[in-house]
């Protein structure tokens, strides 16, 4: 029997917390709630300690004290938990920054419960699939340029042995580039390969993911050496990969 998905709702509005807890609970989720970042961090730590980790965080951007963007950035440094941001209709810049910080997706207030559940299901399924795919049969280490990719742990390792955690989206994007090294991939092709969310024609998330991956690869966006922008066509990954 599949494990019941555990979701943490982080919002300072008790009405929204109660609404999401009730709706997601009816859909079969184990729902926890927090009113601010500190409560959320304590809840995540306790669940991890009990061996019952949270798989998805629904996180309001505009929290009192430590805001949702800061919490997203801190969580992504140490965790691969799925993160869906809850944003206002006029928070377009914050949504882009949130994706750059490591969020996987976002929903816009006023919330559409059916859309929220659909996005939650898709993200949890992707997180679980990624976790299940990490096994002994995989080619765990791949070398490209000056980097090693530890696929089992989704870590980049530089020549000095320093490790950098990749988010699911970054890992999928890098995988698509490694499989197609030397070939230009359009945004549509990348969207099809990483299947990160239900993409919209105007969605900038591919560009955001590329920017995040470039930073982690220390690839200067002004003069990139690994991920080249081919204007009007897409992106070209220049480094060939081999088993380490």
From Swiss-Prot:
Pathway noted in the entry: Amino-acid degradation; L-arginine degradation [regulation]
Primary location group: cytoplasm
Compartments it resides in: Cytoplasm
Annotated knockout phenotype: Disruption in the aruF mutant prevents growth on L-arginine.
DNA-binding stretch(es), residue numbering of this chain: 139-239
GO molecular function, one term: phosphorelay response regulator activity
Modification sites for 4-aspartylphosphate: 60
Function: Member of the two-component regulatory system AruS/AruR, which is involved in the regulation of the arginine transaminase (ATA) pathway in response to exogeneous L-arginine. Regulates transcription of aruH and aruI.
Protein name: Transcriptional regulatory protein AruR
Organism: Pseudomonas aeruginosa (strain ATCC 15692 / DSM 22644 / CIP 104116 / JCM 14847 / LMG 12228 / 1C / PRS 101 / PAO1)
Gene: aruR
């Amino acid at each position: 029997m599949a494990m019941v998905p555990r979701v943490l709702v982080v919002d300072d509005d008790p009405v929204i917390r109660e609404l999401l807890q009730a709706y997601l609970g009816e859909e079969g989720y184990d729902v926890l709630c927090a009113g601010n970042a500190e409560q959320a961090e304590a809840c995540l730590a306790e669940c991890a300690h009990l061996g019952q980790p949270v798989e998805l965080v629904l996180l309001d951007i505009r929290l009192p004290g430590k805001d949702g963007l800061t919490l997203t950035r801190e969580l992504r440094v140490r965790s691969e938990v799925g993160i869906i941001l809850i944003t206002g209709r006029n928070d377009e810049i914050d949504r882009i920054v949130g994706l750059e910080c490591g969020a996987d997706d976002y929903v816009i207030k006023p919330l559409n419960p059916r859309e929220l559940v659909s996005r939650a299901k898709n993200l949890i399924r992707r997180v679980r699939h990624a976790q299940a795919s990490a096994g002994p049969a995989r080619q765990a280490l791949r070398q490209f340029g000056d980097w090693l990719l530890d696929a089992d742990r989704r870590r980049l390792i530089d020549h000095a042995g320093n490790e950098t955690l990749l988010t699911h989206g970054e890992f999928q994007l890098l995988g698509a580039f490694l499989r197609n090294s030397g070939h230009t991939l359009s945004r549509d092709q990348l969207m099809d390969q990483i299947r990160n969310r239900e993409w919209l024609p105007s969605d900038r998330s591919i560009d955001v993911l590329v920017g995040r991956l470039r930073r982690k690869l220390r690839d200067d966006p002004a003069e990139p050496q690994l991920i080249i922008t081919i204007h009007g066509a897409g992106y070209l990954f220049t480094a060939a990969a081999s088993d380490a």
